Every structure is written in C-alpha cells, then in structure tokens.
A protein has these predicted regions:
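Thiamine diphosphate
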Residues: 1-140, 145-150, 154-161
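Conserved small/polar residues in nucleotide/adenosyl-binding loops
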Residues: 166-168
C-alpha cells in the first residue's frame, strides 16, 4: 500500500524497521529520540491520508508520548499504528528499557485497539490485521527466542477474539 509510511525513534536497526527503509526510502522517517514529536508527525501524516506505522521501544513510545497518543491519535481516532517493541521485562537493556506499564497506559485510551501476537508467524498476521483497522492500534511486539506455537493462533488471528494456548 503506497499510503503506508514508517516512522522510527532512532532505532531502525534495533527494531528492524531498517528493512522498510531499504525497500521504501522515500516513505521512511526517523524522528530521533523525540517520541512525542514523532506522534505529532504521524498524526499530521494520517490527517493527510497516509497510514503511519510508528516504531520504537515500548517503554519510550508509551511513556514519553502518552499525552500525544491520547490527544492526537486516540480521541480523534486517527489511522496510526503504534508498534511497541520489547514490552515487559524481556529486554536485556535494564530497567530503563522495561515497559511494565505500557498496557495500562494504552488500555485506558478510547478508540485504541491493542494487539499482542504470541509468535513470529502471528506477528505477521497481527500487522496485517492492524493495517485493516481504520483507527489507532497499539501492536505490542516481542523479540524472544521462545516460540509459543499453536497452529490455530498462527493461522486465524481475529482481533477481539482470544485463543487458548496450551503449554506442553
């Protein structure tokens, strides 16, 4: 989709958004370490007809830009996709990079859909599902060597419907 643009907070290699930059350099924007400004840029792009995918570490995306996400994306229901990378305690970068409150911050916002895939295969389905939603979405993305696998989960992701995972 030529309307899709990518924005990153100076973390292209770490979040693998450099792959988009290489494929579509004119649709890739690096805001530097200025997450709040990046949300404002994404809001303006969405109002102009683009579909921004904003990518940063979960902790920085949700904490540093919470007010902008609420006022510029969630309340006006703008079509912006937020991809928060390394949520929870999974990061090796220490407490400053641990997003333990990102779900609480995003869950209270109106009009915002939250999607958290459980595996690499489901991540691809989650991104496709997010792209189909006309409105703001928070994708909570993990990078973990542990794979939670369930064929039904990987094949049939339906936003708003949970699936059971069985630990074997």
């Amino acid at each position: 989709n030529p309307r899709v643009v990518a924005l990153t907070g100076d973390l292209a290699p770490a979040t693998e958004s450099d792959l988009f930059r290489e494929a579509f350099p004119s649709r890739f924007f690096a805001s530097g370490i200025a997450e709040a400004n990046m949300i404002g840029l994404a809001a303006g792009m969405a109002r102009g007809g683009d579909i921004p995918f904003v990518h940063s570490f979960s902790v920085f995306l949700t904490r540093r830009a919470c007010d902008q996400i609420a006022m510029q994306l969630a309340y006006p229901q703008l079509n912006v996709k937020l991809a928060g990378f390394l949520p929870g305690l999974t990061t090796l970068l220490g407490v400053s990079h641990q997003a333990i409150d990102d779900l609480a911050l995003m869950r209270v916002l109106p009009n915002l859909t939250i999607i958290e895939p459980s595996s690499g295969k489901q991540t691809a389905a989650a991104v496709r599902a997010a792209a189909k939603i006309e409105g703001p979405v928070y994708l909570r993305l993990h990078k973990d060597k542990t794979v939670i696998s369930n064929a039904e989960v990987e094949q049939n992701l339906e936003v708003g419907k949970g699936l059971s995972l069985i630990h074997i």
